[in-house]
């Protein structure tokens, strides 16, 4: 569908937005947030709620948002998730079909220390997040990102949040090849 997107994932609170916005400034790419494109605040009573009632519905909204936003001749960094918590607080993979439609040039994954992520989320959202669920979510994102990279035959760059600016170096090589 698209041919000018790099997808960067990571769990809530790992620092994706900050890192991705920095990379976009550095590489003159356009920053896109999956939650903004699918208008999360319109479909959820509590925008800080991390559980998703209908994951396929939200992901279809993402594709619609991308279709209405993406322009030829521009390069985009889309920040989102490989997996989400469903309404039962179970980890659920985003369908590979969604990634096929996004058609990213490369994948990035930002990992973080779960204790730091939990602390950041607890403060930001004024909630007490479950350490085990956050760890399970991050582990699931790592495994699934590797699966997607192999299935889509595109590179995956994995970085720790405290050293994720290396991601910029990897992406600049892809970006400069265009």
Q: What are the residue ranges of the model-derived segments?
A:
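Loop/turn-to-beta-strand initiation segments
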Residues: 72-81
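Hydrophobic anchor at the beta1->P-loop junction of P-loop NTPases
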Residues: 8
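Pre-Walker A (Motif I) flank of P-loop NTPase domains
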Residues: 2-5
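Conserved glycine(s) of the Walker
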Residues: 15
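Small-molecule kinase domains that catalyze NTP-dependent phosphoryl transfer to phosphate-bearing small molecules
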Residues: 127-167
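The conserved Walker
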Residues: 12
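Conserved substrate/cofactor phosphate-moiety recognition/catalytic segment
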Residues: 21-62
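ATP-dependent NMP and nucleoside kinases share a basic, alpha-helical "lid"
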Residues: 80-124
């Amino acid at each position: 569908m698209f041919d000018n997107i790099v997808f960067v994932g990571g769990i809530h609170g790992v620092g994706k937005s900050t890192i991705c916005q920095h990379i976009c400034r550095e590489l003159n790419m356009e920053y896109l947030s999956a939650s903004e494109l699918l208008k999360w605040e319109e479909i959820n009573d509590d925008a800080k709620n991390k559980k998703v009632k209908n994951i396929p519905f939200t992901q279809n909204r993402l594709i619609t948002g991308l279709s209405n936003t993406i322009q030829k001749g521009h390069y985009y960094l889309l920040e989102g998730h490989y997996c989400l918590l469903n309404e039962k607080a179970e980890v659920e993979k985003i369908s590979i079909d969604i990634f096929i439609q996004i058609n990213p040039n490369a994948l990035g994954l930002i990992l973080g220390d779960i204790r730091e992520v939990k602390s950041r989320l607890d403060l930001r959202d004024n909630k007490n997040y479950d350490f085990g669920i956050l760890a399970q979510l991050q582990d699931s994102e790592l495994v699934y990102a590797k699966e997607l990279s192999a299935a889509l035959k595109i590179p995956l760059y994995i970085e720790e949040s405290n050293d994720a600016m290396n991601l910029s170096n990897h992406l600049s090589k892809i970006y400069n090849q265009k």
